[in-house]
């Protein structure tokens, strides 16, 4: 049960980070609610494919790239080359942050790297670390790649950090 909740949490944080990144770097092509609904639909398909592929890493990376591309192309003002570049960039950052999370947890607890997939609590801890790093990376990269060099209010984007820390609190309570 905790593993499924964590997986849904992972996809929601990835969607939120992607939309925040795209909103800061590109202009919105459609209205924000329709872009959000499109993103939720894309990530629902992504979640289903992830479940059918039994959380296969290669399928996860490839399909994550495709979902990022579709959201960038349909929901935001990105041309094909830019959408491909940013999709590859975000897929690479996501892979790197997940690998860092796995290495940190396996090093801290002295366990095999593959054990996090069979232990729901370790999986949740890896998810919290990886998604926090992913969100921070998206915010930092969007500061450098934003087309508009005007002042951007950073206050609201940091509210997304509440979710990883609150999930750690919930895990501790369980």
Task: Tell me the role of every PLM-derived stretch.
Residues 1-14, 124-127:
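Hydrophobic transmembrane alpha-helical segments in integral membrane proteins
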Residues 10, 15-19, 39-43:
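Primarily extracytoplasmic/secreted proteins
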Residues 4-8, 39, 55:
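Intrinsically disordered, low-complexity linear regions
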Residues 36-44, 48, 140:
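Alpha-helical hydrophobic membrane-insertion segments
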Residues 16-33, 50-173:
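Juxtamembrane segments at transmembrane-helix boundaries
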């Amino acid at each position: 049960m905790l593993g499924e909740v964590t997986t849904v949490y992972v996809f929601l944080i990835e969607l939120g980070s992607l939309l925040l990144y795209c909103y800061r770097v590109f202009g919105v092509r459609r209205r924000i609610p329709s872009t959000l609904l499109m993103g939720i639909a894309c990530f629902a398909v992504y979640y289903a494919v992830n479940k059918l592929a039994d959380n296969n890493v290669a399928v996860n990376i490839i399909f994550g790239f495709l979902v990022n591309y579709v959201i960038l192309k349909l929901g935001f003002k990105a041309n094909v080359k830019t959408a491909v570049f940013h999709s590859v960039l975000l897929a690479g950052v996501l892979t790197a942050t997940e690998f860092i999370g796995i290495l940190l947890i396996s090093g801290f607890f002295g366990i095999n790297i593959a054990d996090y997939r069979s232990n729901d609590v370790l999986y949740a801890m890896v998810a919290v670390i990886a998604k926090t790093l992913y969100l921070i990376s998206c915010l930092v990269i969007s500061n450098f790649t934003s087309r508009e060099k005007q002042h951007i209010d950073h206050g609201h984007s940091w509210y997304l950090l509440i979710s990883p820390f609150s999930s750690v609190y919930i895990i501790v309570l369980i």
